[in-house]
Design a protein with these regions (language model features):
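Non-transmembrane, aqueous-exposed alpha-helical and coiled segments at domain scale
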Residues: 1-302
Length: 302
């Protein structure tokens, strides 16, 4: 059973409009599947807004068709399975949620250089314009933290980007789980998400320890380190990075988390002395013993 606040119950009853009502019901359904018993307020959302090339959108198998648009507000009935709901019912995202768009399949400006059609480009520009009209900050980036999207420590967020969930959890100390397009979209409308996973303090401690004994001078070193860590992680693991490494800057962290994200399902990585929840090794582990320990050397990176 999901325990709702009085405000959430009013939203579910339709007091704040059909769009929020439907979006919240979808989030409640999602919470029940996850086993969550309550919701958290979402004040930062990062979601897909542009044209898409998802195979599920192309039943005829033709991925070059330019006339399919991705965003849920263009297709409530099929994307969100809400028959009978007028798309016009959705005219804005949640008032207290700062929303920025993710990268998408069509270049925002140089469509000719990427061998895409003008029609596809114009469709993409139209959908981004519609998103902006509904309150989305157009960044078109998979690294929104470089463009002002910065949840603070303890703040709940949703994102469709695997490297962003890592950066926001690990470096900013915010709390979020990687999400799909539809659930993230619904959270951005109703401002709620199921309380589960990395929202919970008991899931935010290290499980696997990585001792760094390799070069960490430049961006490539951190890229390789991220891949090496990711390939050794168990599902749902939280790696702790410790050892004699050079303190990474933002660009090196971006490379590290991108490589870690594509080689694993990791969503939180605690870097001792860098992550706010890992000021010390003991703080990172939270009183737990590691399930496994690894030493990453230059030989491994080669």
């Amino acid at each position: 059973m999901i325990h709702l606040t009085p405000y959430e119950q009013r939203m579910l009853d339709g007091e704040f409009g059909a769009a929020k009502q439907v979006a919240l019901q979808k989030i409640i359904d999602y919470a029940q599947i996850l086993g969550a018993t309550e919701l958290v307020p979402i004040t930062k959302a990062h979601l897909c807004c542009g044209s898409t090339c998802e195979p599920s959108d192309f039943p005829d198998g033709n991925l070059d068709r330019p006339d399919i648009l991705a965003m849920g507000y263009h297709d409530w009935q099929t994307k969100l399975k809400c028959p009978g709901l007028d798309p016009a019912a959705f005219n804005s995202f949640n008032e207290t949620t700062y929303v920025m768009d993710d990268v998408h399949c069509c270049d925002t400006f140089q469509w000719q250089w990427t061998q895409q059609t003008k029609e596809f480009y114009e469709n993409n520009r139209q959908i981004l314009s519609d998103a902006a009209d509904r309150g989305v900050m157009i960044g078109s980036t998979c690294a929104p933290y470089l463009a002002g999207w910065l949840p603070v420590m303890g703040e709940y967020f949703v994102t469709t980007e695997s490297s962003n969930v890592l950066y926001s959890n690990s470096i900013l100390g915010a709390r979020g789980n990687g999400g799909g397009g539809n659930t993230t979209f619904c959270s951005a409308i109703c401002g709620r998400a199921p309380k589960w996973g990395l929202h919970l303090p008991e899931n935010r401690h290290g499980t696997h320890v990585f001792h760094v004994a390799c070069d960490t001078k430049d961006k490539t070193d951190w890229d390789l380190l991220g891949a090496a860590v990711g390939r050794r992680l168990a599902p749902n693991a939280v790696p702790v990075i410790c050892g004699d490494f050079e303190r990474p800057d933002l660009i090196k962290l971006k490379s590290f988390f991108t490589a870690l994200a594509v080689t694993s399902g990791c969503e939180l990585c605690l870097i001792v002395g860098v992550s706010p929840e890992a000021q010390t090794y003991e703080m990172a582990m939270g009183g737990h013993e590691p399930a496994a320990e690894f030493t990453i050397t230059n030989e491994i990176l080669q």
